[in-house]
Amino acid sequence: SDTEAPRLSQYAYGEDYHFVLKWKLKELLKWMRAEWGDIGGRVYVDSAPILERAWARQSGLGWIGKNSLLISKKKGSYFFLAEMLLDVDLEPDAPVTDHCGTCTRCIDACPTDAIIKPSVVDGSKCISYFTIELRGAIPEPVKGHMENWMFGCDICQEVCPWNRHATPTAEPRFSPHPRLMDMTNSDWEDLTEDIFRDVFKDSPVKRTGLLGLKRNIRALRQESE
């Protein structure tokens, strides 16, 4: 709608993926137990110190791109990772070879130079860190480089050639809140607690909270002045 409105990372438009993926994995575990008997298993969605990208690469799901994200030939990098630990042996697929080649689009496009070398992101320079995890004020040197992102950042994915043919998800819980798609720049400027609760009721944006989001919006306004 409003092309000047602040931007959200695409994963944040629908329900929080932590809840959706955990529910899906628990349902899968129920099915496996019904089929195979009483097997032991636990599911994790960002809730344990598991090197998920490394294990995903080893399992043949994709390769780790220069933007540090897992990339699949079929899906690009627009997908989530979650894990299920089981006490049964499963035969994995073979690891996938790197297909980034000489491409450096993600490195060249990052406005804060957060990708310090291929496959290595300095989190303390990443727009996603500043707009989601940071609890203080946005540093002055960062203002002017946020590229209109108020929550997260997708730049290194948007420029990736492997995402050219990415398709929308079929999962209805990841569909955007209807009100969210119509919000204008002025709507975001005047964001109230009631609107925030309505639009982001089950959203990962709750991690930043209303005050954090308004801080980010103020920083973006200062960029444009």
Where are these regions (language model features)?
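Short Fe-S-cluster ligation motifs
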Residues: 130, 134-151, 181-206
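Long, compositionally biased charged/polar accessory segments in the mid-to-C-terminal portions
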Residues: 198-201, 206-224
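Long, well-ordered alpha-helical scaffolding segments within enzyme catalytic domains
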Residues: 97-102, 111
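Alpha-helical packing segments of well-folded alpha/beta enzyme cores
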Residues: 24, 28, 106, 213-216
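Auxiliary alpha/beta "docking" domains used to position bulky ligands
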Residues: 1-99, 138, 147
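Amphipathic alpha-helical blocks and their helix-capping loop/short-beta junctions
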Residues: 168-183, 188
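Iron-sulfur cluster-binding cysteine motifs and their immediate structural context
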Residues: 105-129, 135, 148-173
